Amino acid sequence: MNIEATIIVMVYKNLNQVIQTLDSIKKQTYSNYEVIVSDDGSPNYTQEDFDKITEQYKNEFTYFKLINNGINRGTVKHFNSLIRQAKGTIICPLSSGDQFYNENSLQEIMNAFDQEDKLIYTSKRMIKKENSIEYYPSLYQVSLLDQSNHFFEYIMKYGNFVSGASTYYKKEIFDKYGLFDEK
């Protein structure tokens, strides 16, 4: 069976929060994915800590791997190494402590890639106190993505509206354009 999605969970000094992330992944209705959890050399955990998590979750997922880098390589090198290991056609990065919004989140991500031929998707929602939901980026911000000079001007003035925590990639984007710049 071909794996369609790879959920990458990056950890640094917050392994204690990975349980809520893994529990959120476990609740997903979509099932054709692998989970790669990788610690980037946190100095405050032992191999025994990693072994406990592996033991707890190895049977919860069809494909599960926990990696302990041993040394800190930095976020970008760490992420690039995990992209290289990913078997899925869609990359869904999470950080330790992140949770999917609901049990259909991964299915919705996969549907978005199925419905349109895009290499990258990003979206975020702000849930306000009165339980209303505001979607980001706005339609105006989306239009800026097709106008690179206006996009860069906008993010320099108003901040970057593209959130790494809610950006998903077809793996082929990295084959076509390369990995993230490690400099």
Language-model regions: role of each:
Residues 22-23, 47-51, 80, 88, ...:
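Short alpha-helix within the catalytic core of nucleotide-sugar-dependent glycosyltransferases
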Residues 68-86:
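Glycine-rich, basic loop-to-helix element that forms the pyrophosphate-binding segment
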Residues 122, 143-183:
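Conserved nucleotide-sugar donor-binding catalytic segment
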